[in-house]
């Protein structure tokens, strides 16, 4: 096991009455100023959640302002609007109500409010944040794990880039997690979330450092649990309210555990699939989970001979495949089992299923060049990928 630092300071309130703790948590972590309530749109309003939050804040004496309309693959322009609003209103805490896109936007706004330049500087590696507005979360879409992670991912529409920035400074101060809030999610969002949750662990599971026995066992347990829970929710019939709650609770907590470095540290993680997907969703604005499902099998087949035993473990211990004694065949069977799982959940495999058409060679080369930053950056720890490798994986998915 390698040496590591583990820092996860987010206070989590998990459970069916977790929303009742909101006023106390806001009081505990808010700086001087108003609360900015940040949210996406429809479901938060239709469910009455936004009204309940506003009532709690008002009755507790907190001044607040609202900003809605946060979209999937959150935009830099919206971050800029949020920064301007924070300067104008004097915001002391950002309350993100929603999923990863809302939380990522909140983190970016927090960083940018205390920075004289463009917040995009953090994402292109030009600067590092020195302060931020505290962020709190009311989670409604378990997927990205941003409620506990140090990550934020933002899309720049002008440059057609989707980039991440990681900083412990931006970790949410608290996360309120009520699995009932995820009951009304459409199947597509549930499936995208399950793919993303599993992928955050798979990016850490497929590593060259296979002597991390505890992390490996934890990862396999999490992957099995999410797969089985998603199968119940998406493929089961006449699921009882109790069984639905059990499955939704497991997925919501797995969302956080999968991306808080418990399953493996960043230094030993791969994340090439994430980097390649970011280029896809930057150009085509597809759901992140769907993009991951589309590209992962091609990555897996391209790199599996780096360590077949790891893929055999994945096949047998996660996907339930029988080991036939031939490592390559068993590894391939595990990848096919994952593809079958994606299809059961209504997720795409390959570009044709994701986009409705194949991608041109020109676009493949463009994405490979951007992903590798002109072949100066080679993502991947299980296998380091240069620009030609990345293009080859895109072609396999085509």
PLM region descriptions:
Residues 10, 114-217, 313:
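A glycine/threonine-rich phosphate-anchoring loop and its flanking beta-alpha core
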Residues 91-109, 140-146, 283-286:
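Glycine/serine-rich anion-binding loops at beta->alpha junctions
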């Amino acid at each position: 096991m390698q040496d590591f630092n583990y820092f996860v300071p987010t206070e989590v309130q998990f459970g069916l009455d977790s929303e009742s703790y909101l006023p106390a948590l806001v009081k505990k972590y808010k700086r001087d100023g108003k609360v900015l309530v940040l949210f996406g749109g429809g479901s938060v309003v239709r469910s009455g959640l936004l009204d309940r939050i506003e009532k709690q804040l008002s009755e507790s004496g907190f001044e607040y302002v609202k900003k809605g309309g946060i979209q999937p693959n959150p935009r830099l322009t919206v971050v800029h609007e949020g920064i301007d609003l924070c300067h104008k209103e004097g915001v002391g805490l950002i309350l993100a109500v929603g999923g990863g896109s809302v939380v990522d936007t909140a983190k970016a706004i927090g960083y940018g409010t205390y920075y004289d330049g463009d917040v995009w500087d953090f994402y292109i590696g030009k600067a590092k944040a020195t302060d931020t507005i505290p962020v709190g979360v009311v989670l409604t879409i378990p997927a990205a794990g941003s409620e506990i992670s140090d990550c934020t991912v933002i899309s720049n529409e002008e440059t057609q880039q989707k980039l991440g920035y990681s900083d412990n400074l931006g970790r949410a101060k608290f996360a309120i997690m009520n699995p009932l809030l995820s009951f009304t999610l459409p199947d597509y969002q549930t499936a995208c979330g399950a793919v993303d949750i599993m992928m955050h662990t798979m990016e850490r599971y497929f590593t060259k450092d296979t002597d991390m026995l505890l992390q490996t066992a934890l990862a396999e347990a999490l992957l099995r649990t999410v797969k089985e829970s998603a199968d119940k929710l998406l493929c089961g019939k006449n699921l009882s309210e109790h069984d639905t709650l059990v499955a939704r609770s497991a997925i919501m907590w797995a969302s956080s555990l999968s991306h808080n470095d418990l399953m493996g540290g960043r230094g030993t993680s791969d994340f090439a699939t994430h980097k390649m997907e970011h280029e896809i969703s930057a150009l085509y604005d597809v759901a992140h989970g769907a993009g991951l499902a589309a590209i992962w099998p091609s990555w897996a087949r391209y790199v599996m001979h780096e360590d077949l035993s790891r893929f055999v473990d994945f096949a047998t211990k996660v996907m339930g495949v029988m080991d036939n004694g031939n490592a390559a065949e068993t590894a391939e069977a595990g990848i096919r089992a994952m593809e079958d799982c994606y299809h059961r959940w209504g997720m795409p495999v390959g570009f044709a299923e994701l986009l409705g058409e194949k991608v041109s060679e020109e676009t493949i080369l463009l994405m490979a060049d951007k992903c590798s930053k002109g072949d100066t950056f080679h993502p991947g720890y299980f296998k380091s990928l240069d620009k030609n490798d990345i293009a080859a994986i895109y072609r396999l998915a085509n």
